[in-house]
């Protein structure tokens, strides 16, 4: 699966509009993840998962940084996220379905923060992009 030029442009444009709030976006997406899919909390037994906790904000920043890296390297997402893929597959052993859950939460967060810009086409482009990101993050499982 690959993005068309128009889809790449939409993904980069949306990220450009949200990048100044990227850490908050990552944190909000994680909060949505833990609220909607409470089973994902098992990967963070040592975290204070209450809204606004320093640990939640720190990990939200990491999520946002990874998405930002993928956007910056939109033509080579696999290269940009190779180390993160290995970490999640071999060390953290995160169930691959959780990346799809997080992708959904990121879509909802982007839509809620950019209602005028997150059109149906932008949603479709971001959904496809996050599917690529999820695929890259789970490719080491095979």
Swiss-Prot record:
Tree of life domain: Eukaryota
Location of the Globin domain: 2-142
Phosphoserine PTM positions: 53, 73
Pfam families: Globin (PF00042)
Positions that bind heme b: 59, 88
UniProt modified residues of type N-acetylserine: 2
Any one GO molecular function term: iron ion binding
GO biological process, one term: negative regulation of transcription by RNA polymerase II
UniProt cross-references to InterPro entries, sorted A to Z: Globin, Globin-like_sf, Globin/Proto, Hemoglobin_a-typ, Hemoglobin_oxygen_transport, Hemoglobin_zeta
GO terms under cellular component: haptoglobin-hemoglobin complex; hemoglobin complex
Keywords tagged on the record: Acetylation, Heme, Iron, Metal-binding, Oxygen transport, Phosphoprotein, Transport
Gene3D superfamilies membership: Globins
Family affiliation: Belongs to the globin family.
Role, per record: The zeta chain is an alpha-type chain of mammalian embryonic hemoglobin.
Assembly notes: Heterotetramer of two zeta chains and beta-type chains.
Database matches in PANTHER family: HEMOGLOBIN FAMILY MEMBER, HEMOGLOBIN SUBUNIT ZETA
The protein's name in its UniProt record: Hemoglobin subunit zeta
The gene coding this protein: HBZ1
